[in-house]
């Protein structure tokens, strides 16, 4: 809370949270991407219908559940189920009341003989990872039953028998080729990102790739769904849009190109740094 410091958050909801908590230097600033950095990378042999690049988020949730009563476990499952229905919002913190945390920690302390407990923030993030992991698994399972899906990650999941696990790809050397070669690049945001535009979305666009993403409120401040980005509302809508865009190549290419132009125009590092310096000069 030092007044000399400025902290920039790409998620407006987080910036507002810290401002309300007395961090006067908290500011909102959307992320940036540099298409020039990716321009020299040649398109490789990464062709597929749908590509997903990222973690599968295998959380510590299942391990934690071993120390919980059936009641506590059921309550946390209810929180995960409720969060899974929310697109573009985060309700886990609101549902993790002080009474809930006391109940959970009572179970943990009993199971560990007084040696283990969790903070509200630790439990919230664990539930967020579990929720996102389940969403990503469900999406990949549903899509791999219908089309060719490549997963680029250090993580694997034996349940996804029809998906192709392609391992890690380097951010600068291989990632741009993946985004350009894949017909559809799928983004499923970590649900703790409440309003902001994830870097993955901007990177895909900066590479000239087509992105299908869950809805993020700040995305709508810059992009128009169906013109320079594709947005799904839920799993059913995601499947429908994947099938639609796989059948409409020219539209897919036009949206990808429009997204690329928008990133070039509105998400430059120079503009972000200029804004940061202007904020610093206010004092």
Per-region residue spans from a language model:
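Short active-site oxyanion
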Residues: 2-6, 228
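Extended, charge-rich helix/loop segments that form flexible
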Residues: 58-148, 152
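Nucleotide-sugar donor phosphate/pyrophosphate-binding loop at the beta->alpha transition
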Residues: 1, 9, 32-37, 119-133
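Short, surface-exposed amphipathic charged segments that create phosphate/polyanion-binding patches used
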Residues: 2, 40-49, 164-167, 245-246
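A short, aliphatic-rich alpha-helical micro-motif
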Residues: 1-2, 179
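Short aromatic-enriched loop/helix-cap "lid" or pocket-rim segments at secondary-structure transitions
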Residues: 39-42, 61-65, 162-163
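Catalytic binding pocket for nucleotide-activated donors in carbohydrate/polymer assembly enzymes
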Residues: 12, 16-29, 34, 130, ...
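Donor nucleotide-sugar binding/catalytic pocket of nucleotide-sugar-dependent glycosyltransferases
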Residues: 5-15, 23-37, 47, 52-58
